């Protein structure tokens, strides 16, 4: 499974990347706003840090304008993936941009039917939003399972990029189902290292070591 980090926080990306935890990055207008920086400037800096795909999202609503924005975004760096919404215009833009050889991430997917359309339009990634489905009492993981089954049945090459990740369980459940990629906030990725029994065991080891009166260095 590939790990993408869902943030425009350059310091957080650099920290995880230095540990080999980052295979790519996803951004969106909300994350750019949170960063307080110019979209082109911060996206270029992220692309310089991370070798893998960096999703930069268009903001237009019409296909022609999305295509123009996408063609501008891909000039930032070779590893840019153009992110488009799962609307009819977004699918039209996806088809054109993918036909031009650009990577496309189709985002805001909430149904298997939408995922089929994205694959047919040539999407590199499909981003089903797990947490937002859970918020309205739908099973986000069931959607991942449905898309996995359909894509495997018909050998679609579009990668399932599980998004709207809210917890460590979301990550492990998506991994078990077979999502190709997860994108999660830095805090959730770092939380994967935490376990109460690890803390308890370390506390005991440290207490016992103190009783030996020894030093390693």
Swiss-Prot record:
Claim: Transport is one of the keywords in the record: no
Main location: cytoplasm
GO MF annotations in UniProt: aldehyde-lyase activity; transaldolase activity
Active site: residue positions: 83
UniProt signal peptide: none
Reactions catalysed according to its record: D-sedoheptulose 7-phosphate + D-glyceraldehyde 3-phosphate = D-erythrose 4-phosphate + beta-D-fructose 6-phosphate
Keywords attached to this entry: Cytoplasm, Pentose shunt, Schiff base, Transferase
Alphabetized InterPro entries for the sequence: Aldolase_TIM (IPR013785), TAL/FSA (IPR001585), Transaldolase_3B (IPR022999), Transaldolase_3B/F6P_aldolase (IPR004731), Transaldolase_AS (IPR018225), TSA/FSA_arc/bac (IPR033919)
Subcellular location: Cytoplasm
Protein EC: 2.2.1.2
Pathway given in the UniProt record: Carbohydrate degradation; pentose phosphate pathway; D-glyceraldehyde 3-phosphate and beta-D-fructose 6-phosphate from D-ribose 5-phosphate and D-xylulose 5-phosphate (non-oxidative stage): step 2/3
Keyword Transferase attributed: yes
GO annotation, biological process: carbohydrate metabolic process; pentose-phosphate shunt
Function: Transaldolase is important for the balance of metabolites in the pentose-phosphate pathway.
Alphabetical list of PANTHER family matching this protein: FRUCTOSE-6-PHOSPHATE ALDOLASE 1-RELATED, TRANSALDOLASE
Family: Belongs to the transaldolase family. Type 3B subfamily.
Protein name stated in the entry: Probable transaldolase
Gene symbol of the encoding locus: tal
């Amino acid at each position: 499974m590939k790990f993408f980090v869902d943030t425009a926080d350059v310091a957080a990306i650099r920290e995880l990347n230095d540990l080999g935890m980052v295979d790519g990055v996803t951004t969106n207008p909300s994350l750019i706003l949170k960063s307080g920086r110019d979209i082109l400037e911060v996206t270029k800096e992220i692309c310089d840090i991370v070798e893998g795909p960096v999703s930069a999202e268009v903001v237009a609503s019409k296909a022609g304008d999305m295509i123009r924005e996408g063609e501008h975004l891909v000039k930032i760096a070779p590893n840019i993936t153009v992110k488009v919404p799962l609307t009819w215009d977004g699918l039209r833009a996806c088809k054109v941009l993918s036909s031009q050889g650009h990577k496309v991430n189709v985002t805001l997917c909430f149904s298997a039917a939408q995922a089929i359309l994205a694959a047919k339009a040539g999407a590199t990634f499909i981003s089903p939003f797990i947490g937002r489905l859970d918020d309205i009492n739908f099973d986000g993981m069931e959607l991942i399972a449905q898309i996995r089954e359909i894509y495997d049945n018909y050998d679609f090459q579009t990668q399932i990029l599980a998004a709207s990740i809210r917890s460590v369980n979301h990550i492990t459940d998506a991994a078990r189902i077979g999502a190709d990629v997860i994108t999660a906030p830095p805090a959730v990725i770092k939380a994967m290292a935490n376990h109460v029994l690890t803390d308890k065991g370390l506390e005991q080891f440290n207490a016992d070591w103190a009783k030996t009166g020894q030093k390693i260095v």
